[in-house]
């Protein structure tokens, strides 16, 4: 689950448990934070339709932010959340009152503004996008 849905302490504890147990922790779609990395455990970085943590200020996929985070030694896999199935046609919404500075920083969204995870399917921004996500050495 994402930072915000879970506290910093909960994410730290989960990552320590993942490291000790030999399993991976999933970030949730809210982005990769230092709290997910705290215990040295393996990470499955989830990217959803809102591109949180890997987006431009305009909300588009940012291949440079993606590459920087994907290269982290603890990130062992990347999960692409293809759509918001729990709320078809609506998407997920984090109310503006919950978008504090720290959450805004990790998600790459403005502080104090409603944060929407679109219901639409995950889009690769260019026909060659699969190669950009995979990287040149894949």
What do the predicted segments below correspond to?
Residues 1-138:
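Active-site entrance/lid segments in N-terminal catalytic domains of soluble metabolic enzymes
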């Amino acid at each position: 689950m994402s930072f915000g849905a879970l506290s910093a302490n909960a994410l730290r504890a989960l990552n320590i448990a993942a490291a000790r147990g030999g399993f991976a922790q999933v970030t949730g779609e809210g982005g990769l934070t230092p709290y997910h990395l705290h215990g040295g455990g393996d990470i499955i970085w989830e990217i959803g339709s809102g591109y949180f943590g890997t987006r431009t200020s305009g909300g588009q996929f940012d291949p440079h932010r993606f590459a920087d985070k994907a290269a982290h030694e603890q990130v062992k896999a990347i999960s692409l959340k293809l759509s918001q199935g729990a709320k078809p046609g609506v998407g997920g919404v984090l109310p503006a009152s919950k978008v504090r500075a720290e959450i805004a920083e990790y998600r790459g969204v403005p502080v104090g503004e409603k944060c929407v995870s679109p219901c639409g399917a995950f889009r690769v921004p260019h026909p060659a996008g699969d190669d950009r996500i995979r990287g040149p050495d894949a």
